[in-house]
Amino acid sequence: MIIRALPLIALFVLINFSLGYAQKIFQADSPDEASVRVFAVEEPEQADLWVCFVWEESEITRTGLWMDMRFSREADVIIYFVDEEKDANLKIWLVDTIEESKWINDAKKSLLQIKSPEK
């Protein structure tokens, strides 16, 4: 039974990653190095995205699940956490479980879209 499900699981993962939304992040040392400036809000209704940090690459199954990478070259997106909400272009609420992660403000999805390499 599990062997039959493997192609479906592989297809699901492939489709999910082909949607082009970054999940591997690197935290820059300065805002000039980042493509997205992030602010962690104090209330969930203030957020654009509810984020859950994961520890294993295999856990990255959808948007809102972020894995903090050690090196910028490993990341899909480089972020910088700002101190003031007004300086952010993405506001996040940190959640405890994978199931809670989700977009609240769909208009902000393009901030985490992976750009296709130019030919």
Regions found by a protein language model. Give the residues of each.
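Sec-dependent N-terminal signal peptides
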Residues: 5-15
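Repetitive, compositionally biased segments used for assembly/scaffolding
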Residues: 21-119
